[in-house]
Amino acid sequence: MDEEASRTARESLELVFRMSNILDTGLDRHTLSVLIALCDLGVNPEALATVVKELRRESIPDSVTTTPSIH
């Protein structure tokens, strides 16, 4: 990658990261970079969004998602 293309890629990632923060997505630069690369390879962005949501749902501890039982 030449210097200009590298600079443009960094600026684009920074812009996407700022937008991500405004939207409070919780995604870091590395994750956003991977998602962008997958989109560039032709992966459906809506499918990626679904996967990210599902992975987040699975990563929430059970104690947070369930109500405590009253004995």
Swiss-Prot record:
Subcellular location per the Swiss-Prot or TrEMBL entry: Cytoplasm, Cytoskeleton, Microtubule organizing center; Cytoplasm, Cytoskeleton, Spindle; Nucleus; Cytoplasm, Cytoskeleton, Phragmoplast
Disruption phenotype: In the gip1 gip2 double mutants, embryonic lethality and impaired development of male gametophytes, severe growth defects and sterility, characterized by microtubule (MT) misorganization and abnormal spindle polarity, resulting in ploidy defects.
Main location: cytoplasm
GO MF, any single term: histone binding
InterPro entries referenced in this protein's UniProt entry, alphabetically: MZT1 (IPR022214)
The UniProt record lists the keyword Cell cycle: no
Keyword terms of this UniProt record: Cytoplasm, Cytoskeleton, Microtubule, Nucleus
Tissue specificity statement from the Swiss-Prot or TrEMBL entry: Mostly expressed in siliques and flowers, and, to a lower extent, in leaves, roots and seedlings, with highest levels in young tissues and meristematic cells, and the vasculature.
Subunit structure: Homo- and heteromultimer. Part of the gamma-tubulin complex. Interacts with TUBB2/TUBB3, GIP2, GCP3 and TSA1 (via C-terminal domain).
Primary role: Required for gamma-tubulin complex recruitment to the microtubule organizing centers (MTOCs). During mitosis, modulates gamma-tubulin complex localization, spindle stability and chromosomal segregation. Necessary for gametophyte development and embryogenesis.
Protein name from the UniProt record: Mitotic-spindle organizing protein 1B
Organism for this UniProt entry: Arabidopsis thaliana
